C-alpha cells in the first residue's frame, strides 16, 4: 500500500498491487474524482468515524493524474484505506475507471451522469487513438 501513488511500480502501463497489509484497514473509503476534483467520498467498510487524510488524497490524485505514460480517465474512483499506526495513515487500495465501480451511496446525483459521459467520451477517443 502506498501513500505516494507515484511510487507504485508499473507493469505494461498498469499499476500493480505490490504490498500485503497484515493489520488490515481501520476504515475504507471510495473517492469519486472528476477532472482532478473530488466529487464525493463514501465509506464502504470499517469505522465511519476514522477519516482518511484530505491532503494525502489530494496528493494521490495529483500523482496519479501526472504519472508519466498514463492515459488517465477524466472520471474514476480512488479507493483508500486508513491503517493503524501511531499516526493514522492513508494508503491507496486501488483505482477504478468510473464505469467499473460500485457507487456506494454516491450522493452527488448531478455529477453522476456527467462522470459516466466524460468517461465514455474518453474511452471512445482512447479506442480511436490506438
Predicted regions and their residues:
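C-terminal active-site "lid" helix and adjoining low-complexity regulatory extension at the edge
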Residues: 71, 84-130
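Active-site nucleotide/adenylate-binding loops and adjacent lid/helix of ATP-dependent enzymes
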Residues: 1-68
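Anionic group-transfer/hydrolysis microenvironments
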Residues: 42, 81, 96
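A short glycine-rich, hydrophobically flanked beta-strand micro-motif that places a catalytic Asp/Glu
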Residues: 29, 71-85
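Poly-acidic low-complexity segments
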Residues: 53, 79, 107-110
Amino acid at each position: 500500500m502506498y501513500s505516494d501513488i507515484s511510487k507504485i511500480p508499473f507493469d505494461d502501463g498498469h499499476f500493480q498491487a505490490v504490498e500485503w497489509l497484515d493489520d488490515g484497514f481501520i476504515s475504507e473509503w471510495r473517492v469519486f474524482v472528476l477532472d482532478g476534483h473530488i466529487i464525493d467520498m463514501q465509506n464502504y467498510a470499517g469505522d465511519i468515524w476514522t477519516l482518511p487524510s484530505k491532503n494525502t488524497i489530494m496528493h494521490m490524485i495529483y500523482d496519479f493524474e501526472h504519472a508519466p505514460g498514463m492515459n488517465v480517465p477524466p472520471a474514476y474512483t480512488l479507493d483508500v484505506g486508513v491503517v493503524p499506526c501511531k499516526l493514522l495513515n492513508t494508503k491507496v487500495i486501488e483505482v477504478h475507471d468510473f464505469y467499473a465501480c460500485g457507487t456506494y451511496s454516491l450522493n452527488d446525483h448531478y455529477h453522476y451522469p456527467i462522470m459516466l459521459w466524460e468517461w465514455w467520451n474518453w474511452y471512445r477517443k482512447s479506442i480511436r487513438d490506438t
